[in-house]
Amino acid sequence: MVPLIVAVSVGGIAGTLLRFATGNWVNANWPRHFYTATLAVNIVGCLLIGVLYGLFLIRPEVPIEVRAGLMVGFLGGLTTFSSFSLDTVRLLESGQVPLALGYAAISVFGGLLATWAGLSLTKL
């Protein structure tokens, strides 16, 4: 159990740091478009979880520590629903209703599409 906990923890640290770096970069370069950091990590995370899920279906012998470290740890640290929700509320509160609705729609449907695309890539 300890190796599994370590794998998830290390993956979580890496994913969280990547999300933090992405947010800092976007805020430094595109402060008016703060929401694009969350959108980017969530869409990329959805693509990656689709790819990993498909690969692990093909290769079930991949150790649970690797699977959990990547899917639960890394992708769990990288992606975030709470930040997506806060970004949407911030856009709504600033009166940018069409942008908020578009952002929410792209996040949800883009995430679903990216997950499907990632899984489909493993079936080529």
Curated annotation (Swiss-Prot):
- What keyword terms does UniProt attach to this protein? Cell inner membrane, Cell membrane, Ion channel, Ion transport, Membrane, Metal-binding, Sodium, Transmembrane, Transmembrane helix, Transport
* Gene Ontology MF term list: fluoride channel activity; metal ion binding
Gene Ontology cellular component? plasma membrane
Task: Name the domain of life this protein comes from.
Answer: Bacteria
Per its record, the protein catalyses:
fluoride(in) = fluoride(out)
Q: What does this protein do?
A: Fluoride-specific ion channel. Important for reducing fluoride concentration in the cell, thus reducing its toxicity.
Name the record gives this protein? Fluoride-specific ion channel FluC
Q: Which organism is it from?
A: Pseudomonas fluorescens (strain Pf0-1)
